[in-house]
């Protein structure tokens, strides 16, 4: 019986250290070293209301906004993941055709592949700078802004995630759309 009680104490101590202690330590390190990321990288509107996260894509469909990559999970953060469909699936091909048609792509003006294909998690908040520039004319026209100004805003918000290791610069779609809203209200 004595060894049984010792075993229970050991299990309790191990759980306390490994579950509660480790979790608390990781949480504390996150709060100190990366408080924004630890809190979900939330983005708030001017009135302080949280409107999204810089780490999760949102579905923008109005022509006045830049559109993110397609999502196999309908931009639902709780169900992140791919569609698990084969690249030869007719569903995938049909969705790609619909997306290409939605953008009005032609043989002379082909759609960047990333804008027709969902990311692995279905929640990628970024598109390439090239993908954003592809949409600039539509967004500028819908907002009544000069295309050069919209393109300048894209370049301003583009960043290289891996410095010299990443071939393409990326743009966060939500942050770019919010910047456009600020430009529109200021102008």
Curated annotation (Swiss-Prot):
It is a single-pass membrane protein. The system is composed of three essential subunits: KdpA, KdpB and KdpC. The gene is kdpC. This is Potassium-transporting ATPase KdpC subunit. GO terms for cellular component: plasma membrane. Part of the high-affinity ATP-driven potassium transport (or Kdp) system, which catalyzes the hydrolysis of ATP coupled with the electrogenic transport of potassium into the cytoplasm. This subunit acts as a catalytic chaperone that increases the ATP-binding affinity of the ATP-hydrolyzing subunit KdpB by the formation of a transient KdpB/KdpC/ATP ternary complex. It is found in: Cell inner membrane. Its main location: membrane. The keyword Transmembrane helix applies. Pfam families: KdpC (PF02669). Disulfide bonds: none annotated. HAMAP family: KdpC. The chain crosses the membrane at residues 10-30.
């Amino acid at each position: 019986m004595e060894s049984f009680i010792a075993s229970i104490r050991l299990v309790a101590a191990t759980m306390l250290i490994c579950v509660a202690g480790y979790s608390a330590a990781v949480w504390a390190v996150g709060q100190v070293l990366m408080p924004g990321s630890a809190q979900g990288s939330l983005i708030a509107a001017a009135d302080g209301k949280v409107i999204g996260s810089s780490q999760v894509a949102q579905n923008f469909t109005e022509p006045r906004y830049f559109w993110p990559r397609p999502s196999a999970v309908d931009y639902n953060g709780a169900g992140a993941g791919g569609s698990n469909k084969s690249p030869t699936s007719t569903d995938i091909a049909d969705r790609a055709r619909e997306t290409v048609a939605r953008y009005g792509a032609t043989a002379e003006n082909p759609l960047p592949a990333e804008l027709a294909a969902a990311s692995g998690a279905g929640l990628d908040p970024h598109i390439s700078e090239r993908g954003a520039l592809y949409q600039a004319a539509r967004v500028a026209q819908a907002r009544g802004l000069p295309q050069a100004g919209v393109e300048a805003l894209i370049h301003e918000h583009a960043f290289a995630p891996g410095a010299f290791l990443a071939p393409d610069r990326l743009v966060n779609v939500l942050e770019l759309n919010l910047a456009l809203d600020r430009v529109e209200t200021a102008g």
